[in-house]
């Protein structure tokens, strides 16, 4: 049996992308929790360029970057396909995955900005949500009825965004404004591939509230 290890952070949407893919494929693996402030020698050796999680180690060989890891898992292991078989549908899935990946920083940074910069960040998030709302019209998931590659890539907006909103006390996703996205998010959270492997919401909420408070405290500290 091939040896599979996953290095990750429990609170990281990127680590959970890989966990979901492994579980969809039915791959047995060893999960190794990393310490953000004291990264292991295994992590630093496995990802010397970026020094970050997730890292998948398969038969001693490290693969890094969550979306690259997803494709590796899909191509390497037997089980249900994650990417569509049709070349055109596969290209679309990759397009939406990249779109979502490119917007991650904007979503996260919005909650750590203030004043005019935060308002600009919100507008960027609203534009992203408009695009997604249009794409998800009359769809259960990005590829139709099947949970797949683009949905895995969307986990930050599918689950973590709601935690950010609650932790920061500011709602960006309103069902009357983004009805298709809101319906997709409800399906998403209730999907078995997702809800069986989510981090505890209360612990995640406490973690990010502490992060938000630390940022606020650092801004108000005397220079």
Swiss-Prot record:
Matching PROSITE patterns: GST_CTER, GST_NTER
Domain of life assignment: Eukaryota
Residue span(s) of domain GST N-terminal: 2-81
GO biological process annotation, one example: glutathione metabolic process
Any GO molecular function: glutathione transferase activity
Enzyme Commission number, as recorded: 2.5.1.18
Residues annotated as domain GST C-terminal: 86-212
Protein induction: By auxin.
This protein's UniProt keywords: Auxin signaling pathway, Transferase
Similarity-based family: Belongs to the GST superfamily. HSP26 family.
Name recorded for this polypeptide: Probable glutathione S-transferase
């Amino acid at each position: 049996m091939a040896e599979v290890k996953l290095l990750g952070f429990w609170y990281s949407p990127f680590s959970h992308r890989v966990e979901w893919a492994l579980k969809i494929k039915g791959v047995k693996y060893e999960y190794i929790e990393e310490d953000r402030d004291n990264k292991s020698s295994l992590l630093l050796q496995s990802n010397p360029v970026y020094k970050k999680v997730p890292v998948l180690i398969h038969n001693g060989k490290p693969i890094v970057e969550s979306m690259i890891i997803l494709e590796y898992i899909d191509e390497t292991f037997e089980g249900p396909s994650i990417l569509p078989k049709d070349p055109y549908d596969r290209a679309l899935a990759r397009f939406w995955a990249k779109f979502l990946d490119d917007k991650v920083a904007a979503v996260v940074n919005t909650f750590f900005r203030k004043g005019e910069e935060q308002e600009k960040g919100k507008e960027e998030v609203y534009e992203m949500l408009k695009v997604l709302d249009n794409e998800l019209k009359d769809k259960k998931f990005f590829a139709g009825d099947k949970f797949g590659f683009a949905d895995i890539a969307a986990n930050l907006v599918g689950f973590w965004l709601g935690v950010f909103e609650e932790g920061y006390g500011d709602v960006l996703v309103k069902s009357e404004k983004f009805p298709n996205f809101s319906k997709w998010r409800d399906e998403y959270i209730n999907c078995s591939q997702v809800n069986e492997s989510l981090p505890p919401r209360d612990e995640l909420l406490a973690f990010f509230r502490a992060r938000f408070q630390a940022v606020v405290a650092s801004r108000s500290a005397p220079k």
